[in-house]
């Protein structure tokens, strides 16, 4: 309900232009968010995206998956598997759900770690493609560290690993992309697991995982509340929540 009320607070006309921000709805956002009890942020942000931490303190609403549960191929998420890197033998098919260049550029920050709201897309995060399939960041570029939980970037460790069997075989490479000329060079990483994870089931070229999919995390609830507070001119309270 908190999420619903936040959408409803931004009242629109027939052309979808916001014409009013409903303070009563915003207050309801806060009220419903405060009713979420017993939850907390994960001590390590990466735990939210790793097998072994399902239904943790930050998980509010999640699709549940399982393996070795007596079914033919287990109740695993093959949807997630369809998004695994397509161009490496470590995974399977099919390399969908990729980050755009615009999205990746949006992770750029200034020297203080704050987002570049107006200028982030003026320069791409890298502008050199080297022969090894990796690339350095463009000069002077700094990134929000959450990008390394989210997107496979050439030359950076994939899923917190450098190696599975051979040196650097888990360092994301241009060759991992399905069709770089069409889809770009970035990989789907947040919802993937390391290929040696016991959570994986392989059926032909497809891989499924028993890792749950979180639809709502406690972090989302906190941000809904923070947005409502800021819109109600309670900026310091909203910022305190954001900076947790």
Regions found by a protein language model. Give the residues of each.
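C-terminal substrate/ligand-recognition segments
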Residues: 136-244
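An aromatic- and glycine-enriched ligand-binding surface/loop that stacks and positions planar moieties
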Residues: 3-176
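Substrate-binding cleft of carbohydrate-active enzyme catalytic domains
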Residues: 1, 5, 222-225
């Amino acid at each position: 309900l908190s999420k619903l009320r936040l959408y409803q607070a931004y009242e629109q006309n027939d052309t979808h232009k916001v014409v009013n921000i409903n303070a009563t709805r915003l207050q309801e956002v806060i009220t419903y968010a405060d009713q979420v009890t017993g939850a907390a942020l994960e001590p390590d942000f990466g735990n939210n995206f790793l097998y072994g931490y399902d239904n943790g303190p930050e998980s509010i609403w999640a699709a549940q998956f399982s393996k070795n549960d007596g079914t033919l191929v287990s109740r695993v998420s093959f949807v997630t598997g369809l998004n695994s890197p397509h161009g490496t033998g470590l995974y399977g098919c099919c390399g969908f759900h990729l980050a755009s260049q615009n999205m990746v550029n949006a992770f750029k920050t200034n020297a203080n770690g704050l987002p570049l709201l107006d200028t982030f897309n003026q320069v791409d995060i890298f502008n050199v493609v080297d022969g090894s399939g990796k690339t350095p960041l463009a000069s002077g570029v700094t990134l929000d560290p959450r990008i390394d939980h989210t997107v496979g970037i050439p030359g950076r460790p994939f899923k917190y690993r450098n190696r599975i069997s051979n040196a650097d075989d888990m360092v994301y490479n241009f060759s991992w992309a399905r069709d770089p000329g069409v889809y770009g060079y970035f990989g789907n990483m947040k919802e993937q697991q390391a290929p040696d994870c016991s959570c994986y089931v392989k059926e032909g070229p497809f891989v499924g995982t028993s890792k749950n999919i979180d639809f709502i995390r406690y972090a989302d609830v906190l941000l809904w509340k923070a947005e409502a507070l800021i819109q109600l001119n309670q900026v310091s309270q909203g910022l305190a929540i954001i900076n947790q």
